[in-house]
Amino acid sequence: KRFLTDNEITEKLELIGCRLRICLEGWEVDVLPNRSQDLKREIDLIEEIARLIGYDLFDQKIPEPLVPGKLTNHQLATRRLTNSFINNGFNEVLTYSLVQMNDEKDRIKISNPLVTELSCLRDCFWHEHIKIVDQNIKAGNQGCWIFEIGNVFLNENNKNVQKETINGAISNIKKYGEWDTSGKSIPLNYFEARGKLQQALSCLNVSITDKPNDKFSHLHPGRSSILLIEGNESGYFGEVHPKVLVGNKSIKDLYLFSINSDNLIKAATRRKIWTPEYKNYAIVPSIERDVSFLFNKKFIVLDIINHIKKVEKKLLEKVILIDIYDDPNMSENLINYTFRLSYRDKEKTLQESDISEIHNNLIKSIETKFNSKQRT
């Protein structure tokens, strides 16, 4: 029993017309054009050498150590995400990766397309998803929530790249959610639709923040946002721009989303933050206070919430936005936001006197910082 020598390896490869150049890790191999389809990888060359020497001369021994196979963190997170979307009412769809050339003619063309309509690799999903929603609504399925995890193909810096993305569309309320709307299918507003997406993504426990959209022309500029993961732009969410739906009478309100899968899953698996953490259960109740303010529309809700958390760090446990009221009788630049503030002390039950001063100082800080006015 022995290992193959370098001379035996080079001799067999040269026998089939390969040209070899010695490098630091072994050889660089040039393959004849007529063998380029079957000799693409290192394992193909190994199989060819074994064939020429004779399979019967090799020792039939299984490599050690043998370890059971398992899913990678990326695969586990992807499956977890898929199940979460399905559990939250979304339907998974599958669309062609081949599409027709767009008006900008910046899609990657394939060399020998069967038909003109399938001559390029897709660079986005939203065109096909709009068609799916349109077909469902025309078929009587008024509430259509879909998602798809797949690859897009882009040309960046004169180099073709492949990126995995999470995409989807949300239109109207699902049938099982119509019990409180007298059986009528009504459109979701921006915040409700964004909440549905956030609920589906919460399984990975990754913080996703929004900033105003200034890039994606197929989205409504005032009802869309760029999604940030760990400070990096990683996708978008928003209502489709009316110009995209010109001539379409079946779709009223439609929200699209696209998220870079690598950025999302890397953020979740790097520290395994999607793995549940156990904490001590709070044995004392919290005190909740609802507070409403009139803000200028230029202020972003996330900035307001971050300011509240920054001002009070000791007793303030949670801040959530519970209501938005845009009264047409108010000034065009003003909007009412209502927040719910939860206070809790881990060691004792809070009394009204414990939080009254803190709560009042918080209100004054918000009014000063954002030039807002509390509504009572």
Which residues fall in each region the model found?
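Extended, well-folded interaction surfaces typified by the phenylalanyl-tRNA synthetase beta subunit core
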Residues: 1-144, 342-345, 354-376
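Conserved alpha/beta core surface patches that mediate binding of polyanionic ligands
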Residues: 2-16, 44-47, 92-93, 123-171, ...
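A carboxyl-terminal module marker
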Residues: 6-9, 13-18, 22-24, 175, ...
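Residues forming anionic-ligand binding surfaces in small-molecule and nucleic-acid pockets
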Residues: 22-25, 52-63, 108-112, 152-183, ...
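Internal insertion modules embedded within essential enzymes
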Residues: 30, 34-82, 100, 159, ...
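Short, structured patches in soluble enzyme cores that scaffold and shape functional sites
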Residues: 31-33, 112-114, 151, 170-172, ...
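Short glycine/proline-enriched turns and hinge-like loops at secondary-structure junctions
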Residues: 40-41, 104, 121, 140-143, ...
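A general structural signal for short secondary-structure junctions and capping/turn motifs
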Residues: 83, 87, 117, 136-140, ...
